[in-house]
Amino acid sequence: MSQLRATKPGILVCAAIGIFVFLYLRNPTSEDPEEGPTHPAVVECGFYPDELCSALFEGKEAALQIAKFCKDPHGSEIVARLHRPGNCSRISRELHFITRPLSAEEGTFPLAYIVTIHKELALFVQLLRAIYLPQNVYCIHVDAKAPKKYKTAVQSLVNCFENIFISSKREKVAYTGFRRLQAEINCMKDLVHSKFQWSHVINLCGQDFPIKTNKDIIRYIRSKWNDKNITPGVIQPPSNKSKTSQTHREFTPEGNIYASPNERFRDDPPHNLTIYFGSASYVLTRKFVEFVLTDTRAKDMLRWSQDIHGPERHYWVTLNRLKDAPGSTPNAGWEGNVRAVKWRSEEGTVRDGCKGRYVQDSCVYGPGDLPWIIQSPSLFASQFDSAEPLVVTCLERWHRLRVLGQAEVPEEPHWHFQRESHLNRRLNP
């Protein structure tokens, strides 16, 4: 039986010490001070990555100690494969993309995805291969500020898949600024005018990751949300009024773009709309998207949103509360498990603490957050970054095991991340 599955934590501590000693012996400290310090070769921590992941999912304390020096090198391997010469067949195979619909149920219910990205190339590839299926369609918005090398790498990957494309118009996206909303509108226009059929659209960013399978997502949509949009939110609370009553402008310090408040107060909402406040995440029907792109109220609301703070947290939920909008939910509140986020403001109340670190008041997950993530009822989790690569590596192995466990077609060998999985299958009901 694997040491990491042992019930006594003392065994895990011994394992951690043993691995550390082995790494130290393989990478002794240089006696030449000018050579600088050496670090354990991260690849040495990959003997049993699934077993370490299993221990992390089970919340074993010793596994957290091991994870501190086992920084998975997976990201650099992914980027290297993208830059290596070769054909698209090799790329899809080596990057473990699933190349066939996994069931008739999924094949007849195509989804559309809008993915906005600006950094973290390896994380984007991991996200894309987790949500990719050939019957779906994907619009990728690459931030206009992104480095040329990054844009080229994304384009080379996208070129290998007929149902993935870069948005026709790119924006310089600002945190809480209008251009994030505009970027998604641009993708919606492209999706509506594409040759692909799709029933619902889901928006993601490059630091998100699925915690439900494609089949799970479809069944969730078809449950109480059938033909309805999912836009969690409520009537704008008084504490949030300044976000829309005061104008905001975007400015660029040292290449970054931010939205900053002005002292000028703005006009009332168009058409006497009641403003709602909610999540920036959504699942929208195609008919609602077509409504957003053509309805006068939606267009006027978009113009009105150009200089408010965080317009994406007002725009979708406000329009989805209109009684005559397709698939609207006028009386809904915060219902809808779209994205799991640990907010700083909720720590100690509705959420346990962030085991990683907070950035912009939301948790960037660490290994200690994995048990909470996989128990969440949400479809996706946010947010992840390359500082803790093992988190996404573990999560995608767990997710792929679930995906293939639901498959109703023969599996291809390259759909697996390795020939034999050591992940604890009890984690995948």
From Swiss-Prot:
Record EC number: 2.4.1.-
GO MF entry, a single one: acetylglucosaminyltransferase activity
GO cellular component: Golgi membrane
Top-level EC class: transferase
Protein name per Swiss-Prot or TrEMBL: Probable beta-1,3-galactosyl-O-glycosyl-glycoprotein beta-1,6-N-acetylglucosaminyltransferase 7
Organism of derivation: Sus scrofa
Subcellular location: Golgi apparatus membrane
PANTHER family: BETA-1,3-GALACTOSYL-O-GLYCOSYL-GLYCOPROTEIN BETA-1,6-N-ACETYLGLUCOSAMINYLTRANSFERASE 7, GLYCOSYLTRANSFERASE 14 FAMILY MEMBER
Function: Probable glycosyltransferase.
Tagged with keyword Chaperone: no
Stretches of the chain found on the membrane's Extracellular side: 26-429
Pathway(s) it belongs to: Protein modification; protein glycosylation
InterPro entries from the UniProt entry: Glyco_trans_14
Membrane topology: Single-pass type II membrane protein
One of the GO biological process terms: protein glycosylation
Transmembrane regions: 9-25
Intrachain S-S bonds: 53-205, 139-354, 160-187, 363-394
Keywords: Disulfide bond, Glycoprotein, Glycosyltransferase, Golgi apparatus, Membrane, Signal-anchor, Transferase, Transmembrane, Transmembrane helix
Family: Belongs to the glycosyltransferase 14 family.
Glycosylation sites: 87, 272
Membrane side Cytoplasmic: residue ranges: 1-8
